[in-house]
Amino acid sequence: LKWKGGKGDLVRDFVDACLKHGVKPGIYLGIRWNSFFGVHDFKVAGSGEMQGNRQAYYNQMVEGMVTEICTRYGPLFEIWFDGGASHPEKGAPDVLPIVKKLQPHCLFYHNEQLAEARWGGSESGTVGYPNWSTFAYNYTGSGESAPSGISKNGFALLKHGDSLGKYWVPAMADAPLRGHGGRHEWFWEPGDEAHIYPLNNLVDMYYKSVGRNATLILGLTPDNTGLLPEADVQQTLLQADYVSA
């Protein structure tokens, strides 16, 4: 690798940049799918001994990766598993005890055992009103692993929480910055600056997330230079100026 002589560490650079600017670093990991190992919904494709060996190797790789993330970069604010992390009793990687042992103050989101925060039920940057931080379950699951009540009425339980819930599971309202005008793109592509949300949309998201007792997570991703596009940066600064005015 030519970049930094093959000795670069993107996670280190990211965490250092966060700390430099007073931002608590969090890490987003995807372990539900892996094309190299042929993994779909946490399971390696195939059957028999070969499948079992590949599944064991994949689990070992994932658990090693999570251990590395939890030990090399100091305290983390949150680890977010995209699509969750399945239950180890189903043969999936066992990541919860690793995070809890090595990052005891880090928010864990999420598997079929625990969710210390919850997805807000859409990728619109908003939640419903009212929105309670209390919840009926201490996990949210995903797909078929989700508790039966979660998917009812358009994910109403995720969008509103439960005023009588006994678990503290506050909502996160996520949206990609480049999600305007019929586009919904979490990753950078050239020539789609027209799909950056206008300021009035971003302000509306703020009022309907932070203003409704949720955290707004706005998706920005680097371009092919490794930096955040200037147009994206300027638009988020406009939002910040409006909110702080």
Locations of regions flagged by a protein language model:
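Mature catalytic domains of secreted/periplasmic carbohydrate-active enzymes
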Residues: 1-245
